[in-house]
C-alpha cells in the first residue's frame, strides 16, 4: 500500500520507508524459502497459517511489484516475477496439497482467481512482457465477462462454474457474492481504460448496477454477503 501511495500519489519519503520496512520483513519471514507465502505471521515473523491460500501469493506479488517500481530494486522485481510464475502454475489447483476436496467428484472453477488476476496484471505491468501482458488481460476479461457473467440469469455473476464454464446445479454453483462481483467490475473498468475499450467499461458499469440491485437488502439496507 505504501509503495502504491509513493508511486501514484506523492513521493513522500516516510511512505517509501514504511514500504521498504514491510518488504524486508516479508522477504525474510513471509515465505518458506521457495516463495510459498504464508497466509499469516505473528509480529515476530513466525508463521501462523501455512501457505494454502493463493491470495497470499497474489498480494505478495503486488507488494513487491510496486516496491520494485518505487525503489528500482531488481531483487524486489525478481521476487514479484518468481511469485507470479508460481501463481500461474497453481491456476488449476490454487490450494495445491491443502485442497480438501475429493478429486474427480465435483470439479469447479472459481471466480476469485481470474478476478484478482485482472487487477494483478495491471499492478505488475512494468515487469511483464508486453505480448504476455496483452494475452493475460484478454484471458482475464474473457473469464470474468464470458464465463462467470451469466446473461441467462439476468446479467449476474456467479462464483463457481464447472471446468467447461457451465452452470452447476448445486450449492456452490448457485452461489452469488454481490460485493465480490462489484469489486471485479472495478478491475474490469481499469482494464477497459487501459485498453481504450469504452464498451467494456459500459458493460462493467451496467453489471455493477445489476449486482447492486440483486444483492441489496431492501429492508435494512446494505449488500448481502
Regions found by a protein language model. Give the residues of each.
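Glycan-recognition and catalytic cores of secretory/periplasmic carbohydrate-active enzymes
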Residues: 1-225
Amino acid at each position: 500500500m505504501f509503495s502504491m501511495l509513493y508511486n501514484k500519489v506523492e513521493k513522500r519519503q516516510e511512505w517509501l520507508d514504511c514500504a521498504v520496512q514491510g518488504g524486508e520483513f516479508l522477504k525474510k519471514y513471509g515465505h518458506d524459502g521457495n516463495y510459498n507465502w504464508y497466509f499469516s505471521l505473528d509480529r515476530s515473523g513466525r508463521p501462523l497459517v501455512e501457505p494454502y491460500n493463493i491470495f497470499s501469493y497474489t498480494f505478495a506479488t503486488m507488494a513487491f511489484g510496486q516496491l520494485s517500481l518505487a525503489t528500482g530494486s531488481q531483487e524486489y522485481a525478481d521476487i514479484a516475477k518468481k511469485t507470479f510464475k508460481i501463481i500461474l502454475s497453481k491456476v488449476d489447483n490454487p490450494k495445491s496439497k491443502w485442497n480438501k476436496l475429493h478429486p474427480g467428484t465435483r470439479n469447479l472453477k472459481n471466480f476469485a482467481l481470474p478476478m484478482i488476476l485482472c487487477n494483478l496484471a495491471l499492478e505488475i505491468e512494468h515487469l511483464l512482457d508486453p505480448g504476455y501482458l496483452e494475452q493475460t488481460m484478454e484471458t482475464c476479461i474473457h473469464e470474468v465477462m464470458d464465463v462467470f457473467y451469466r446473461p441467462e440469469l439476468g446479467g449476474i455473476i456467479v462464483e463457481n462454474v464447472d471446468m467447461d464454464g457451465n452452470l452447476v446445479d448445486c450449492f456452490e454453483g448457485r452461489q452469488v457474492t454481490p460485493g465480490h462481483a462489484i469489486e471485479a467490475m472495478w478491475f474490469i473498468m481499469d482494464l477497459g481504460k487501459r485498453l481504450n475499450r469504452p464498451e467494456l467499461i459500459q458493460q462493467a458499469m451496467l453489471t455493477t448496477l445489476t449486482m447492486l440491485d440483486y444483492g441489496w437488502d431492501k429492508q435494512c439496507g446494505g449488500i448481502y454477503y
